[in-house]
Amino acid sequence: MSENPQSAPAQRYTAELAGQIETKWQDRWEELGTFYADNPTGDLAGPLASHNPFFILDMFPYPSGKGLHVGHPLGYIATDTLARYRRMKGDNVLYTMGYDAFGLPAEQYAVQTGQHPAITTNQNIANMRRQLRRMGLSHDSRRSFATTDIEYVHWTQWIFLQVFNSWFDPEATAPDGSQGAARPITELIAKLESGEIRPEDGSDYNSLDRAAQAKVVDSYRLAYVSEAPVNWCPGLGTVLANEEVTADGRSERGNYPVFKRNLRQWMMRITAYGKRLSDDLDTINWPEKVRTMQRNWIGRSEGATVRFDVPGAREAGASLDSLDVYTTRPDTLFGATFMVVAPEHPILGGTVGGDAGDEAALTLPASWPEGTKDAWTGGAASPKEAVSAYRAQAAAKSEAERADEERTKTGVFTGLFGIDPVNGRAVPIFVADYVLWGYGTGAIMAVPAHDDRDWAFARAYDLDIVRTIGPADDPYGHDLEAGAYTGDGVAVDSANDEIDLNGLAKDEAKAAMIEWLVAKGLGHGTVTYRLRDWLFSRQRYWGEPFPIVWDEDGVAHALPEDMLPVELPEVSDYSPRTFDADDADSSPEAPLGRAEDWVNVTLDLGDGPKTYRRETNTMPQWAGSCWYEMRYTDPTNSERFAGEENLAYWMGPREGKVSGGTDMYVGGVEHAVLHLLYARFWQKVLFDLGHVPDSEPYHTLFNQGYVQAYAYTDARGQYVPADEVEGDETTGFTYKGEPVGREYGKMGKSLKNIVTPDEMYDAYGADVFRVYEMSMGPLDLSRPWETRAVVGSQRFLQRLWRNAVDEETGELTVTDEPADDKTRRLVARTIAEVTEEYENLRINTAISKLIVLNNHLTSLDAVPRDAIEPLILMLAPVAPHLCEELWSRLGHEASLAREPFPVVEDSSLLVEDTVTAVIQVNGKVKARIEVAPSISEEDLIAAALAEAPIVKALGGADPLKVIARAPKLVNVVVKK
C-alpha cells in the first residue's frame, strides 16, 4: 500500500494529495465542458466540427448493483487514453458512456424486493457514473443516456417499426450496390396486388380476406411472429435466443435446462442478410478471430435443393406431397438410401409440430407398409405410435443434446417413402432428432457410403449402403464394411439414361448434377446459411414494449409514430411465471399479460375507434444495444433518432475509411456472434431504407483482454481474503500463518478476491490506478491483478512529481536552461516512439518509454523545462490529473486537454549516435571512422574504401576481397 501520509513530506505525491488534485481537475473539466464534442448541426453544434472527427466507443456496461471491480475499467482506461491522445492531435473526439439498463438482473432484484426496477437501475447508474467520473474518464456527459430513458425507448420502438414495415427484396439493389435489400412493405403489397408476386400457395392475393392477406404480408416481413421451435427455459420462465444457450443445452444465465418447444414468438429475419453479413466482413477492420467466428456462425455453404416426391403422404392426410432437401453433395444422389426429417417437420402433421401426445393428428400411414424391417419400428405397432413416442422423447432434449456428434443417433421409420429423382428408388423416410427444424429444410437425404453419421445410422437400422465415390487410383478399393469413404475422388455407379457422372471429380460432378436437376425441374443450386432467424421476444417485464397491437382477427398492427413511445405499465408483480426447471411441457406467461387495463385498449388507427390487445412480450436486451452509437451522435434530437448530417459526420465513410461506422470500438470478444451480429443486421436494414450513411456500424474493433486474479483456499478448501495472504511463489503463500493454495481465474465476491476502483482511489489515487492497469501488459491479452505491484506505478508518478516540484515546499524546481544534447535526443526519440505506440494502442510500451525518459531526468542536477514539458504532455493521456496539475504549475493557464501533442521538430535529433568502425588492410588496422549504428554493409564498405590510408594501400588496384561486419569492422584484402 502507499506510505503513511503522516510521515511524508508536506508536498509528496501521496494518495491524499492525488485525491485532492484529481477531484479538483474533474470539477474543472466538468465546469468548462472540456471534453465536449461539437456536432456540425443541432443543439450540440460548435466550431470543433470543422476538425477531423474521431468516434471512440466502448461496449457500454450493464449497471449492476455490485458496481465496478478493477477488471471492468481496463477497456475504458484504454479508450480514454486514446480519446485524450486524439484530442491532442487536433481531432474532434466523440467519447461518451451510456448504460445498457434493461435486462434480467434488475427485474430479478425487483421481484425479490418489490421495488420497481427503474429505481434500482437508476441507483446503480448513479453509482457507476460516480466511479467512472472519479477515474477521470473524459466523457462528453451531455451525450450519456440509459436504454431505459423514455426518449431512447421511443426511438428503439421506432427502429423496430422500420424493420417490421420492411421486407427483403432479393431483386432490389442496396445503396452500396449489394444485391438484395430491405424495401418498404408498401412495395410488397403493391407487387402482391398487381400479381407480380403471388402467395406461396399460388392463390390470388386480391381474392383473400383481410386476415388472409395480412398473413401473406407478414410472411415476408423482416420482423414477424412465428410459431416455431424455440429454446424454452422453464427455470427462467422465458425463451432464449440460440446464442444464450450453452453448448451443453443450458441457459447462460442461471444454468437451467433448456428445451425445444413450439411457441409463438417474435423473430427477426436476419437470415435474409446472411450473404451481406458474411461478405461485408471484408470491408471492416476487425480482428481476424472475430471475423472467423462470425463467418462460422453465419455458416455459408453451397450445394443444391432437391425435390423428393412422397407418394403416400397425401393419402395419409399430409399437407405436403414432396420433401425438399438441401445437400452440399448433389453428386452423391445416386447413393441416397434413406431420408431423415426433423421431429418438428410439418409433413408429419400433429396438433402443433413437435409437441408430444398428438398421435391421432399425425398424418402418417395407419400401418407399417410392406418391406418394413423390425429395426425401423422402435417396437411400435404403427407409424403413428412410433413417431408420436419418438417426438415426445425429442421434445425433452435440448438442441445441444440433439446436435451432439458423439451421441448415438436414433430414429424411427415414418411409414413413408421418398422417390430419389435420379434413379426412381423408393427410400424410407425416418424421423430422427439429430436433424434440426430450422436448419436448412429440416429434411436430409442420407448417403451412408460417404458420411460417417449416415453410415452409423444405416448399420444400426439395416439400411443399404451404395457407393458413388472412390479414390481416383482405385475407385472400388475402399471397404464400405469398415466405414464410410469421406475423401475426394471420382464418381462411380452414378449414371442414368440422361446423365453420367462416372469418372468426374467432385466439382465437375456437382456442377453437372445441378445443371441436370434444373433442366428437369427437380431442383436448383442453393447457397444456405447456418444462421437462423433471431428470436426477438422475451416473457419479461423490464424491457421495451412492442409498438404492436392485435385486432380481434389476430392481425398485428403497427402503432403510428405519434403514439410512440409505448411505456411500461405499473404492475404489482414483475416476475414471469417460472416453473420446475425440468418441466418441458410448461408454457410462458408474460407479466405484462396481467396488466389488463394496459393490455386492452381502444385506439383509432385510421378507421375509427376499435378495441385492440397490446403485445405482452417485451424486446430482448439486445434491442437497445443495437443502435446506441447512433444516438450518441445526436442525443437531444426529438425529431429523429439522429440527424442525417450528424450521422454522416461521425459515422459516414471518409478518406482512409472506406466503410463507415465508429473509428474505434473496444470490448470483449464474448460479443462476437451476439451483439455485434445483431447490430450489423439493424444497421444494414436502416442503410437500405436510407436512414444511415453506411451499412456497417463499427469500422475498427479491438478486443481487450481481461483482468483476472488469484484466489486462495485454506486446508478446508474455503476461500480466504486475498488481500490478507502473505508470501510469494518462492516461499509459498500463507494466511494467518497457515499455508494456502493459489488458483488463477476471475474476480468474485465468493472468491474473496474482489478489488474495487474505489479502494484503489483511496490507497493510491486514480492516476496510479490508470497507469498500473495500462502497464500490466498488451491490451489484447489477459493479465493477473496484483495489488502489491501497484506501488511501482506510484513510484513512477512520484518521481515525475519530484522532477518538477520540491516535496517540502511545493515550489517548482524546473530550470529554463536548455537541455543538453543527450537529453534532447532522448526526448525526440521518446516522442517518435510514444506517438507510434499510442497510434497502435500499445499503451504499456508507451509507458515504459516514458519511464525511461523520466528516470533520465531524475539523474540530472536540474530538470530542463524543454524536456519535462514534452514528458508531461506525452503522459497526460494516461495520467491526466497529475499532468494537468504540473502543466498548470509550470505556468500554463489553459488545460492541456487540447494542447498539441509533442512532435519532433528537428529530425536530426533522431539520427542515432555514431559508433567507431575499424578499417583493416590484410588484418592490420589502418583507419577508424565514425558511422551510424544502422549503416548497411554496402555503405560501410564505400566509406572505408574512400579513406586516405586505404586508397594509398590499394594504389589504384581493386581489392582482392572486402570483408565487412557492419557497423564495426571492414577488412580489405590486397596483394602482398
Regions from the PLM with identified roles:
Residues 1-49, 444, 464-475, 479-483, ...:
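Basic, alpha-helical terminal appendages of large translation-related enzymes
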Residues 2-11, 15-18, 23-24, 28-32, ...:
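Residue patterns forming the tRNA-binding/recognition surfaces of aminoacyl-tRNA synthetases
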Residues 6-57, 87-96, 120-126, 286, ...:
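Conserved oxyanion/phosphate-binding beta-strand-loop segments in alpha/beta enzyme cores
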Residues 12-16, 300-305, 470-473, 479-515, ...:
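Long, charged, mostly alpha-helical binding arms that flank functional sites
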Residues 26, 267-301, 346-412, 564-597, ...:
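Amphipathic alpha-helical
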Residues 40-121, 145-156, 325-328, 420-457, ...:
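N-terminal catalytic cores of NTP/NDP-binding nucleotidyl/phosphoryl-transfer enzymes
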Residues 79-80, 92, 349-472, 477-485:
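Catalytic alpha/beta core of large soluble enzyme barrels
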Residues 100, 171-178, 219, 224-231, ...:
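Helix-rich, typically C-terminal accessory recognition domains appended to large enzymatic cores
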